[in-house]
Amino acid sequence: MFKSINREINQIINRGFDRTLRLAVTGLSRSGKTAFITSLINQLLHINQEGNAHLPLFEAARNQSILAVKRVPQQDLSIPRFDYEANLNDLMNNPPQWCQSTRGVSETRLAIRFERQSGLLRHFKERGTLYLDIFDYPGEWLLDLPLLNLDFQQWSLEQANITSGVRQQFAQDWLDKLKKLDLSAVVNEDVLAQIAKSYTDYLLACKAEGMQFIQPGRFVLPGELEGAPVLQFFPLLHLSEEQWQKLKRETKSNSYFAVLNKRYDYYRNKVVKGFYENYFSTFDRQVILADCLTPLNHSQQAFIDMQTGLNQ
């Protein structure tokens, strides 16, 4: 992981000229994203200040191609700034403590000033600057990207297939309410919100038990969408194919069934696709961290659940 970042920086320095590299770091909750980014920034800022013994495998530091590294203002002022100072203080406290969990997207920018041997003149050295934009975002949002290829029925079927064992136990309260709901009836916003809250409580219980394949990811880390109707829907696990087709043919646009479909489509096309277009598709490189020990400490099902999430 760190080796691949080093290799990328080395290649840019060898090519010369100024350039920007957009690096995203993500992972599921408590995988160490914030601590990793804080450490990476700290290591780069101390190049040429500590004899570079702290980065023995980083060729650009070892051969002193990197002249200096400093933090500079980010270009996109609408994205929250990664709080490097506060996170570093957490790690350096006595005793140390873990950094605050990632709740949304944040960014920081480093300017890496370097020089390299010119390919034209033996004693002439070229200088340039690599701007390293580092993004931190919740891995739970990454797990939503497969929804772009699934309609509401397909997603509901996928969720039905994984709702077993511990998940089935946690889902019971929500499923009881779902089975009593007349999907063809005119929607009541309050009832819909209550059942959606039960579904969210189910997802949070799964997360607390070490499950990591959580969809929709914004339900457990809503960010600026907390309380919005777009986060008030849920899969229909109990319907047969025949029931799906009948509801599609016969229900009106103001029915529970139609509104659930509409909200899922809005979430997929606006929230998930918006994240993909505005952030994910713009990253040059991505580091994904995974905490394998926590699921193992919980149960075999939690570990399998993590594998399912990583394979999406």
Give the residues covered by each predicted segment.
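Short coil/loop residues immediately preceding or within conserved phosphate-binding loops
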Residues: 20
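Switch- and interface-adjacent substructures of P-loop NTPase systems
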Residues: 5-9, 17, 43-312
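P-loop (Walker A) phosphate-binding loop of NTP-binding proteins
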Residues: 28
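Hydrophobic anchor at the beta1->P-loop junction of P-loop NTPases
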Residues: 23-25
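Conserved glycine(s) of the Walker
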Residues: 31-33
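Post-Walker A alpha-helix
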Residues: 36-37
